[in-house]
Swiss-Prot record:
Outcome after substituting Y91A: Abolishes the interaction with PDCD6IP, ANXA7 and ANXA11
Description of its domains: Interacts with different set of proteins thanks to 3 different hydrophobic pockets. Hydrophobic pockets 1 and 2, which mediate interaction with PDCD6IP, are largely formed by residues from EF-hand 3 (EF3) to 5 (EF5), as well as by Tyr-180 (EF5) of a dimerizing molecule (Pocket 1) and from EF-hand (EF2) to 4 (EF4) (Pocket 2). Hydrophobic pocket 3, which mediates interaction with SEC31A, is mainly formed by residues from EF-hand 1 (EF1) to 3 (EF3). EF-hand 1 (EF1) and 3 (EF3) are the high-affinity calcium-binding sites, while EF-hand 5 (EF5) binds calcium with low-affinity. A one-residue insertion in the EF5-binding loop prevents the glutamyl residue at the C-terminal end of the loop from serving as the canonical bidentate calcium ligand. EF5 acts as a high-affinity magnesium-binding domain instead. Magnesium, may affect dimerization. EF5 may bind either calcium or magnesium depending on the context.
Descriptive protein name: Programmed cell death protein 6
Topology in membrane: Peripheral membrane protein
Outcome of mutating F122S: Increases interaction with PDCD6IP. Impairs interaction with ANAX7 and ANXA11
Highest taxon of source: Eukaryota
Record annotation: effect of changing S53G: Slightly reduced interaction with SEC31A. Does not affect interaction with PDCD6IP
GO biological process: angiogenesis; apoptotic signaling pathway; cellular response to heat; COPII vesicle coating; endoplasmic reticulum to Golgi vesicle-mediated transport; intracellular protein transport; negative regulation of phosphatidylinositol 3-kinase/protein kinase B signal transduction; negative regulation of TOR signaling
Species of the source: Homo sapiens (Human)
Effect of mutating Y180A: Abolishes the interaction with PDCD6IP, TSG101, ANXA7 and ANXA11. Does not affect interaction with TFG and SEC31A
Residues with N-acetylalanine modification: A2
Binding site for Ca(2+) 1: D36, D38, S40, V42, E47
InterPro entries for this protein: EF-hand-dom_pair, EF_Hand_1_Ca_BS, EF_hand_dom, Peflin/Sorcin_CaBP
Amino acid sequence: MAAYSYRPGPGAGPGPAAGAALPDQSFLWNVFQRVDKDRSGVISDTELQQALSNGTWTPFNPVTVRSIISMFDRENKAGVNFSEFTGVWKYITDWQNVFRTYDRDNSGMIDKNELKQALSGFGYRLSDQFHDILIRKFDRQGRGQIAFDDFIQGCIVLQRLTDIFRRYDTDQDGWIQVSYEQYLSMVFSIV
């Protein structure tokens, strides 16, 4: 299932811009049927995890898989039907393209400098110390780099935290004041 994989190799430079068109529906239906191992008409997180590759020959981060499923599962069925799967496919493909764009050395991993470039490209202005924190938090392999699946997870968490912060930053000055309970509510909403 090469369309799910990111395996760097010769000529694996930056991909097309995020937002590329979806492949043909019959192609996606064939992929959906192969991934739906139990033929339930719904792809579970386990089925999706087994179908995905992060390019490191390790299982795709289950937390990332559950996050993606929860974004697209409109009926709270702990999985995605075919219609929802087309959104999952596009979401993952768009992230692959972003990842390839910032994986400047085509290593299949994002190092600190590549992460800084990616997050800066997304509009974040963060300190070197914070980039170090992100690397430590999302580097499951302990190599000082982030794999594709963990890059997605890190970006999802950063976006959720940013959204929560913005709700409290009513004057948009980059500072908030919250009570301890508000802080706990913010943290528990993303855990």
